[in-house]
Regions:
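Secretory targeting and sorting signals
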Residues: 1-28
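Beta-strand-enriched cores of mature, soluble protein domains
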Residues: 27-153
Length: 153
């Protein structure tokens, strides 16, 4: 049960935090509609798990996370979010917000499940990212980090 909870939580955290590998900003969606690809290294922080349903992973349980986002070995922001479990396998609905220094925010959502590869939708943003739309992937590295790639329109 603990291993299932840990794998599920790491998956959620990695997915949400699902979001990033060391790399560079090739481009970023800005208010003028330009798009591009952003790559981050995500450093997962301990998450909080609230067991609201049946004991152990079950529908209605909640995971909240707050993770660090790095590029080229430098912290460039963080992400916060939550996931609501829909069943005992760890399948969950997740939403989050990335804060990128003084540039603005990017919002995202994804379906979390145990596999280490997650696909997410970029649903909006603020500041330089106020017209952000697109998608991305989060790939868990198995060491408390992940690679996040966002493709913004």
């Amino acid at each position: 049960m603990l291993n299932t909870r840990r794998a599920m939580a790491v998956g959620v955290s990695l997915a949400a935090s699902v979001l990033l590998l060391q790399g560079s900003v090739v481009g970023a969606a800005t208010g003028n509609g330009r798009g591009g690809t952003m790559t981050f290294h995500v450093v997962f922080e301990p998450f909080n798990y609230t067991d609201l349903g049946a004991p152990g992973p079950s529908a209605a349980d909640v995971i909240v996370f707050h993770d660090q986002l790095d590029q080229n070995g430098k912290a460039v922001g963080d992400e916060i979010g939550s996931c609501v479990l829909v069943d005992a396998t760890g399948l969950s609905n997740c939403t989050g917000v990335m804060q990128l220094e003084d540039r603005g925010t990017i919002t995202f959502s994804f379906v979390n499940s145990p596999p280490p590869h997650k696909v997410l939708a970029v649903t909006g943003g603020s500041g330089q990212f106020r017209t952000a739309r697109g998608d991305g992937t989060l790939d868990e590295n198995g060491d408390g980090t992940a690679t996040l790639v966002l493709r913004l329109n």
